[in-house]
Structure formats: structure tokens, C-alpha cells
Amino acid sequence: MVTLSACSSGKETGTLINDGLTDSSKGQKPVKLRIVWWGSQTRHEPTLKALELYTKKNPHVTFDPEFSGNDGYADKLATQAASKNAPDIFQLDLKYFAEYASRNQLAELSTGIRLQNIDVALLETGKYRNKQYAIPLGNNATAMVYNKNVVDKLGIKPPSNDWTWEEYFQFGIDAKAKLADNKYALLDSTSDYDMYTHYQLSKGQGAPITDDGKFNINKETWLEFINKYAALRAKGVVPPAEITATDIEYDAKLDLLHNDKVLIRRSLGAIFTGYDSLKPGVYQLVKVPKGGQAGGFLKPSMFWAVSADTKHAEEATKFIDWFINDEEAADILTTTRGVPVSSTILEHLRPQLKNADMQQVELNKNVAPDAQKYSQGAKGWSNYTEKDYKDIGEQVIFGKISPEAAYDVLIKKAKDYE
């Protein structure tokens, strides 16, 4: 674990809510803030530099940072929060927000942070019972990321922002016809709850789990989706089960897109700089395929939240205000957590944004007009959508259970959560 120092204020934008935001730290009591986040190296390094800058400006504040990949992050944080040992500040995904807020594990953040330059709808995603408990860090859009270099060399029709699911599957078939035997076109999404969510939303059938906690996986649509991937697996368009099982999203070595096993995968705009950093200029972002409706949506990339058990709520709040509103911080962080939430900060950054950054900005612009309404998800269902669904899907991939039997298991498992 690394220990850094931290602090508050650089070139800041907006109007202060309280005078304490720019106070000198001279004579103030030393504070060490535990802070934790997930991501790749392209997020870790700028974040550590930002913490160093904060401490330089506020010498009384130092940091005890922890950072990791996404795998295992949520489980570890949940365990810490349950034992009242959560970090003072932690990165939180929207899918878990309602659970943390309903368990009174988050400190209220309604004052001390300048929010006037942030879209009201985006701020609403961090509210619970009309109170602000989490601060969005980036505008984000669902996406597909593909290897543009390889697709161009294959000479096939590339993905587009207006493509349908039929065109997506045909893209996979066309690509596989020109790929080597040990290379595949599409990732097998049989066990991917998020990918299926896009598919069902695009059919106009709503989210697989409703906001009020009801099972809503349409049987006909789900079997259509699962059987499509079974056919693609048989044709070698998606990898065999044993290769699919090795995939770890965002991992530099095990992500099947990174290691050139597949050409395309579901992703998020906020993740794109991580892909681009490993292979600059190779990847391209496009919208999720559509059905009768769009399949994609806009969402906050992630939140900063403060533990309800922190002894340093005021300093944690000051840091978050600085993180989202300070121009010097923005110069370091750029789009490592998605397109900046502050409209003022985004305009400040525009002249220095690189191609990978601008792809995120353009993706958000393209997704917005027909975006599906994003569902926070019902509280208490994260284990079902993150683990149970994945486990059942993997049994289908390995041929241990038929799609029809798998659907029955999904229904049975859901009764434990309804």
C-alpha cells in the first residue's frame, strides 16, 4: 500500500458554498484519508498524481490509497462497509448505490460541494430519498469497443453507430470467415447480464429486473439471445467455453480483446482510455446495437462516496469538491473516469483532449438522442445480476444445462430476491 499526502484548491471554478474550501491548512490538525478505487494503470497513475497535488496545496491532509482492478473490488468494499471499516472515500458503481444508501453506509453530501455546473439528471443518480449521498465523477455511455486495425485489414463492413443486432451477429460471421482458426470475432455473451440487458431493452421490453425488484427476463427474448450464441459457438464465431472462461475484463493480459482473441466486446466509454493506452490508435468506440429501440444508455461512470463511519467527513467533502471542480486536477485526470461532469471543466479541457478522449465525448453525443432510461436496479439484487446470472450462463456455455432448463433456474433463483 502506498501512502501519499493530499489537500485542497487550485484554479477552481464556480461559486463556493462555504468559505472553508479555500482556507489555508496552516495550523490545522493533520488528517489522513483512506481512499480506494478500481481501474487500470491509466486511472491509477493520474489519481495518485492528483492526490499528491492536493496534499501539496493542503499539507495537513495526507492519503492512504488503495487501488486495484475491478475483479473482487465490490466484494472487498462490501465486507469493509459491513464491518464499519470502509475507507473514508471510496469509488462506488451505480449498481450498488441503492444498497449502500439504504443500509445507511453513506455520509450525506448535500453541502460543501459545488454542483451547479453538473447536469441535474446526472446528480439525481446519486440521490437517495431526495438527499445527495454520492457524487458522479464522469458522464458515461454504454458502448462496443472493437479492433479497428484488424477489421480494416479484413476488409469487412465495420461496426457503426446505427447498426442492428442482426448486423452485429453478421459482422461476427463475416469476420470469422477471414480469421485464423485460433482467432474469434465476438465475445460469448451468454453469461453477460449487461449485454443481455441491452438486447432486451432494444426489444422494448424493459430491464430484466425492474426498479421495484421484479423478475422481468422475457423467456422468448432470452432464449433467442442464448440460442443465437450457441449457434455462433458451434461455428467458431465466439470462442469455445474453455477460452471464454479465461476472460477478465480490463485485464491487460486476460481480457480477450486485449490479447487479440476477439475483435469486439461490450464496454463503457469511460473505460476506453485504458484500452487505448495499451494499443494507441487501434481501438474504436461505437454504440450498442439496436432493435426496435436503442439498446444503450447514459449513466454516471462512477461515484465518489464518503463512508457514514468516517471521522473526517468535512475533509473528505472538501477533497471531492476539489476533485471535480479544480482545473489543475482536471489537467491531470482528464477523462480517466469518463467525460468530466462539470461543464466548465469540460470546456477547459477540450483544447487538450486526445483522440481517445474525444471518442468518449462523441459517443455520449451519439447515444444521448435515443438513449434508454438508465435503471439503478433494485436494491438487494446485485448478487443475482453479478453472480447467479453469470454462473447459470457459464453452465450453458459448458453444456451442463440446456437453455430452457437454465431459464427455469433463473426464475427459481430470482424468488430468493423478490
Question: What label would you give each PLM region?
Answer:
Residues M1-L33, K56, D408, K412-E418:
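Short, low-complexity disordered leader/linker segments with a strong preference
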Residues D93-A143, Q284-V286, L353, K365:
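Hinge/lid segment of periplasmic solute-binding proteins
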Residues K214-T246:
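Glycine-centered hinge/linker elements that transmit conformational signals in sensory
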Residues Y133-L137, T142, E167-T221, V262:
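Extracytoplasmic/periplasmic solute-binding protein
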Residues K56, D64, L154, V237, ...:
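Extracytoplasmic/periplasmic substrate-recognition and gating elements
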Residues L106, T273, M302, V306-N383:
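Mature extracytoplasmic/periplasmic domains
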Residues E52-V120, K153-G155, L254-I264, V341-S343, ...:
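Extracytoplasmic "Venus flytrap"/periplasmic binding protein-like
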Residues Q359-A414, E418:
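C-terminal capping/gating helix-and-loop segments adjacent to ligand/active sites or protein-protein/ligand interfaces
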